[in-house]
Design a protein with these regions (language model features):
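N-terminal active-site segment of His-dependent metallophosphoesterases
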Residues: 4-6, 14, 19, 24-98, ...
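A conserved active-site cap/scaffold subdomain adjacent to cofactor or substrate pockets
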Residues: 219-279
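His/Asp/Glu-rich metal-coordinating catalytic cores
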Residues: 79, 88-236, 242-244
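Short loop/turn motifs at secondary-structure junctions
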Residues: 35, 76, 155, 206, ...
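Glycine-rich phosphate-binding loop signature in dinucleotide/nucleotide-binding domains
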Residues: 74-76, 178-179, 293-295
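Accessory, non-catalytic peripheral segments of nucleic-acid enzymes
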Residues: 254-383
């Protein structure tokens, strides 16, 4: 089992060192680069949209995680970098055992991970006492530490969360120690409440590659150097767009990376433009067409927009049964002929109400109030 130590007594300053391999391998002799996969924000234990999909989405997060380990094995990846929030909350012992077993099945890959804000090392965290497999290197220090892989000419640095929020810019003063040709930083944060950082300072910190986590949308802050992998799978309806992982290679202190789409599902926000001639049946048909176009496996939030027949009211719950539709919002307005209504009702409350909003622009707050008021008055008259 892994046993960790710090050599802070040997190093008077700089990051502490944890256990690392000391054997040189054929890798350096053949001059190959170091192959790595960078993931973040896996959020094992989450139950996305549990009210709609029961526990199926939660299981899918585990399945996606297992698949990425399969990629590591198939491609003989040297390093799997996990930049925080492997778990959505404090991990259970049985969950750690399952993850550790999956890691133990990797025959060529070393795993380095940090704890993020969701799975932070609180006082009773099971992370603190868990014994990991020999190929797993958690960087669970409160301050920057590193693990050295001389056979890969690579050192990986990181620190972990001990609280849910850290407002101090802990990464602004970090620096690579220069002990290996390739030096990687695992970092989690980037907003005001989760280790804010200065991109320019971090870029000048001397690391070959900075593997970022916390922001669920994949993005490059600096090409081939400072990358948010994004969540492996979308976790909630705001995680729109594709999700996946970073695949890269390090050689002589420089990285070459590509982002790989990987998630089994995608949250898609879309709109359907409604016309006066539309009925609920025609809208249902268009919702089906939209889902078929973008994929039945994806999860949808659909907004109905435009002008509908004033006599039509859409049953959005019924429309949402057409596929993996999380929500349908009806933002349509009735297609009233206000000039005709006013001419026919000048001397009534309805006519006076329409006159009050004369000249308001379509789409304005006043126009919305006009539509709602007219609809209420007409409904009352019919009642």
């Amino acid at each position: 089992m892994a046993s960790f130590y710090c050599n802070s007594g040997e190093r008077k300053s700089g990051p502490a060192r944890v256990r690392g391999s000391r054997q040189k391998t054929a890798l350096l002799k053949r001059g190959a680069g170091v192959k790595f996969i960078h993931i973040a924000d896996v959020h094992l234990g989450a139950q996305p949209e549990a009210a709609v999909y029961s526990q199926s989405r939660g299981r899918e997060l585990w399945e996606s995680f297992e698949k990425i380990l399969g990629v590591c094995e198939d491609e003989r990846t040297d390093l799997l970098l996990i930049a925080g929030d492997l778990f959505h909350r404090q991990p259970l012992v049985r969950e750690l055992k399952e993850v550790n077993y999956l890691f133990s099945e990797l025959t060529a890959t070393k795993v380095v991970l940090i704890a993020g804000n969701h799975d932070h090392l609180q006082k009773d965290s099971n992370y603190r006492s868990f014994e990991w497999n020999d190929n797993v290197y958690p960087l669970f220090g409160k301050k920057l530490e590193y693990v050295d892989f001389p056979e890969l000419e690579t050192a990986v640095y990181g620190l972990s969360y001990y609280e849910r929020e850290i407002c101090q810019p802990l990464y602004d003063d970090v620096a690579a120690a220069g002990i290996e040709k390739n030096e990687i930083l695992l970092a989690h944060g980037g907003d005001d409440r989760h280790i804010p950082f200065d991109k320019k300072k971090l870029s000048r910190s001397g690391f070959s590659y900075i593997a970022l986590g916390h922001i669920h949308k994949p993005q490059a802050l600096q090409k081939d150097k400072m990358i948010y992998a994004g969540a492996l799978e979308p976790i909630d309806q705001n995680d729109v767009g594709q999700h996946g992982y970073v695949k890269g290679e390090l050689k002589d202190g420089k990285a070459a990376i590509q982002w790989i789409p990987f998630a089994g599902r995608e949250y898609i926000h879309s709109s359907v433009e409604v016309e006066r001639s539309d009925t609920e049946g025609s809208i249902r048909k268009r919702v089906k067409r939209l889902i078929n176009e973008y994929g039945n496996e994806n999860i949808y939030k659909i907004t109905l927009a435009g002008k509908r027949d004033p006599d039509i009211a859409f049953e959005v719950n019924h429309l949402a049964e057409e596929g993996c539709v999380l929500e349908i919002l009806d933002e349509t307005i009735p297609a009233y002929d206000f000039e005709k209504l006013y001419a026919e009702n000048k001397e009534t409350l309805l006519g006076r109400y329409i006159e009050k909003f004369a000249g308001c622009e379509e789409g304005s707050v006043e126009y919305c109030a006009l539509c709602e008021g007219v609809e209420a008055l007409l409904t009352g008259n019919r009642g």
